[in-house]
């Protein structure tokens, strides 16, 4: 089948670099002579037929912007077979031959459903959590880690002044990669993630020893999926009242801001790759990057698997924090 018209949407939680990916899809599509359409507000916009033509001007000056110019939304209706069929019918009525979906796990499930209804689909990993399997990194992850590291640097300054410990809660319900990479990069004394069991007695004892040996601060980075920051602080105080931990929940600040060059480049490569693969006749595929090489994986395979945690990196962080 010859691809003539493609559409792009962003779905689920936004991530820095989504705009760079949209830009790449549009510019690459136009370069290859395709008609390119944008879908506003993800799958909700698809069901509302909120679809518009995109040209070079529509993606001008967006590569450096956070968020998503196409906007995003949750859509309960699309989770139903009737909603999925409606979405596929709208795309066919519009004559759209291919769809590029940018988002996380839920977005991949949606793309997978559409592919089973005969829509040519490509999925790009747009999520700060870095929890998509079959790709080393997701769009937005590098920027989020940079934001967390910057926050920890600032917290370390003030904690050192008062000889206190700091509990930094970061995003990551099921995947602790933000905590892991930011913790390692910032020299955190403790990293708590959902993938690795932890002993609060050991953590409290190590923190006490650090202060006893002259350390002026202690940083604990905890992924939200491993435990509430306030709860971690409470447990530490129960074991040692002198620790005086202060809790900082970084929240949605981790999703905003200008994407790093790494995220812009990753998004640009993946967006262009998705278009070229659609033209080549591929469908129902997830685009990713492994060892700096662009790869295609069946969406079916991705949505039914869990990303492997990098224990080697976790053990390195533990060794360096002694």
Swiss-Prot record:
Amino-acid positions noted as binding ADP in the UniProt annotation, renumbered to this chain: 23-27, 156, 187-189, 215-217
Claim: Nucleotide-binding is one of the keywords in the record: yes
Q: Does the keyword Metal-binding apply?
A: yes
Indicate where this protein resides in the cell. Cytoplasm
Gene Ontology BP terms: canonical glycolysis; fructose 1,6-bisphosphate metabolic process; fructose 6-phosphate metabolic process
Mechanisms controlling activity: Allosterically activated by ADP and other diphosphonucleosides, and allosterically inhibited by phosphoenolpyruvate.
Residues that hold substrate according to the record: 127-129, 164, 171-173, 224, 246, 252-255
Q: Which cofactor does it need?
A: Mg(2+)
Membership in a protein family: Belongs to the phosphofructokinase type A (PFKA) family. ATP-dependent PFK group I subfamily. Prokaryotic clade 'B1' sub-subfamily.
| Name of this protein | ATP-dependent 6-phosphofructokinase
Organism whose genome encodes this protein: Paenibacillus macquariensis (Bacillus macquariensis)
């Amino acid at each position: 089948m010859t691809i003539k018209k493609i559409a792009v949407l962003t779905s689920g939680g936004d991530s820095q670099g989504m705009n760079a990916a949209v830009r790449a899809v549009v510019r690459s599509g136009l370069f290859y002579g395709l008609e390119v359409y944008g879908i506003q507000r993800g799958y909700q916009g698809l069901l509302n037929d909120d679809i518009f033509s995109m040209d070079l001007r529509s993606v001008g000056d967006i590569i450096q912007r956070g968020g998503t110019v196409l906007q995003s939304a949750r859509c309960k209706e699309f989770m139903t077979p009737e909603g999925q069929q409606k979405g596929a019918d709208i795309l066919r009525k519009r004559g759209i031959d291919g769809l590029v979906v940018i988002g996380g796990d839920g977005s991949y499930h949606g793309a997978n459903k559409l592919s089973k209804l005969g829509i040519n689909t490509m999925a790009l990993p747009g999520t700060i959590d870095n929890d998509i399997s079959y790709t080393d990194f997701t769009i937005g992850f590098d920027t989020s880690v940079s934001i967390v590291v910057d926050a920890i640097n600032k917290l370390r300054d003030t904690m050192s002044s008062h000889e206190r410990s700091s509990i930094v809660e970061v995003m990551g319900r099921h995947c602790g990669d933000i905590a892991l990479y930011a913790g390692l990069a910032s020299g955190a004394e403790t990293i708590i993630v959902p993938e690795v069991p932890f002993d609060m007695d050991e953590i409290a004892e190590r923190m006490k020893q650090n202060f006893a040996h002259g350390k002026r601060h202690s940083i604990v980075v905890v992924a939200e999926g491993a435990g509430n920051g306030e709860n971690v602080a409470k447990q530490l105080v129960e074991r040692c009242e002198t620790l005086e931990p202060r809790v900082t929940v970084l929240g949605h600040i981790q999703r905003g801001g200008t994407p790093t060059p790494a995220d812009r480049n990753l998004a640009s490569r993946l967006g262009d790759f998705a278009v070229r693969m659609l033209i080549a006749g591929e469908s129902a595929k997830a685009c990713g990057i492994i060892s700096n090489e662009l790869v295609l994986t069946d969406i079916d395979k991705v949505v039914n698997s869990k990303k492997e945690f990098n224990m080697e990196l976790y053990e390195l962080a533990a060794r360096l924090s002694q």
